[in-house]
UniProtKB/Swiss-Prot annotation:
Keywords recorded for this protein, A-Z: Developmental protein, Differentiation, DNA-binding, Homeobox, Neurogenesis, Nucleus, Transcription, Transcription regulation
Tissue specificity note: Isoform 1 and isoform 2 are expressed in brain and testis.
Gene from which the chain derives: otpb
Protein name per its UniProtKB record: Homeobox protein orthopedia B
Originating species: Danio rerio (Zebrafish)
Motif mapping: OAR: 296-309
Similarity remark: Belongs to the paired homeobox family. Bicoid subfamily.
SUPFAM superfamilies linked: Homeodomain-like
Organismal lineage: Eukaryota, Metazoa, Chordata, Craniata, Vertebrata
One Pfam family per UniProt: OAR
Signal peptide start and end residues: none
Length: 315
């Protein structure tokens, strides 16, 4: 067993150790700026706090882990780093979105080669596009885009030229048949070319016209009908069944006269007798070329209307 002296020495050693710890604690508090004075009974808590402190790399003992200001500084630094990273990411995305595609500028030699290939075919395959791209120093995608734009321009130009060149696109046809150029020229030259001094339709060939007596009130209508019939007769020689004839009777007298007596060979005078009507042939100007337009001729329709009014006035 230990003697009494040994126990006293041990106790004095423990006191010295406690005093050293208190001094060390006071020194720490002075460095940290604390104002609280320690108590001799807080040796264990002081040792635990001193031993439990964790120091960051590069920090002094004054910036121990028990300092809340140091923790706030670390958190602030982390937040700043995160904000910088987020700002860099958003800035990169905005730059990618705002980045414009490069516009290719073709040289005259490249355009000449592309136009030559376009003249050969409007739809080149991938092999032809790759060969052309290697030849003129472009990428295959650029060549493909150029051909697409060139085809669109060609189609637009073709559509506009067809609109201005087509004869039937600007003016409506209204259902009228298209005439050949030669037939149209002949018809335009010969239509309404009959004159009063023409010897083909001399008065000698119409013996019954001089004996025809028409009331004065119908002189104007008869003149208009005669002018229309002369205009239609001037288009060509009438066939054998086209002699316009009528039988006019006043108060049942049965007066008959031949209006147009044909004088050409092979033509038979046609006369239709009726009680009180004037009948005209509905197929006036029915030459082989006029069969296409006789139903739509405005002149023939007007002539028929005038003949109808004349016949109604006689009745």
């Amino acid at each position: 067993m230990l003697s009494h002296a040994d126990l006293l020495d041990t106790r004095l050693g423990m006191k010295d150790a406690a005093a050293e710890l208190l001094v060390h604690r006071e020194a720490l508090k002075c460095r940290l700026g604390g104002t609280d004075s320690g108590h001799p009974g807080d040796l264990t808590s002081a040792t635990e706090t001193v031993e439990g402190t964790t120091l960051l790399p590069g920090e002094e003992i004054s910036n121990g882990g028990s300092n809340p200001n140091g923790m706030q500084q670390v958190n602030a630094k982390d937040q700043e780093k995160q904000q910088q990273q987020n700002s860099n990411q958003t800035g990169g995305q905005q730059n990618q979105q705002k980045q414009k595609r490069h516009r290719t500028r073709f040289t005259p030699a490249q355009l000449n080669e592309l136009e030559r290939s376009f003249a050969k075919t409007h739809y080149p395959d991938i092999f032809m596009r790759e060969e052309l791209a290697l030849r003129i120093g472009l990428t295959e995608s650029r060549v493909q885009v150029w051909f697409q734009n060139r085809r669109a321009k060609w189609k637009k130009r073709k559509k506009t030229t067809n609109v201005f060149r087509a004869p039937g696109t600007l003016l409506p046809t209204h259902g009228l048949p298209q005439f050949p150029s030669a037939a149209a020229a002949a018809m335009g030259d010969s239509l309404c070319s009959f004159h009063a001094n023409d010897t083909r339709w001399a008065a000698a060939g119409m013996p019954g016209v001089s004996q025809l007596q028409i009331p004065p009130s119908l002189g104007r209508q008869q003149a208009m009908a005669q002018s229309l019939s002369q205009c239609s007769l001037g288009a060509g020689p009438p066939p054998n069944n086209m002699g316009l004839s009528g039988s006019l009777s006043s108060n049942g007298s049965g007066l008959q006269s031949h209006l147009y007596q044909p004088t050409f060979p092979g033509m038979v005078p046609a006369s239709l007798s009726g009680p009180t009507n004037v009948t005209g042939s509905p197929q006036l100007c029915s030459s082989p070329d006029s069969d296409m337009w006789r139903g739509t001729s405005i002149a023939s329709l007007r002539r028929k209307a005038l003949e109808h009014t004349v016949s109604m006035s006689f009745t």
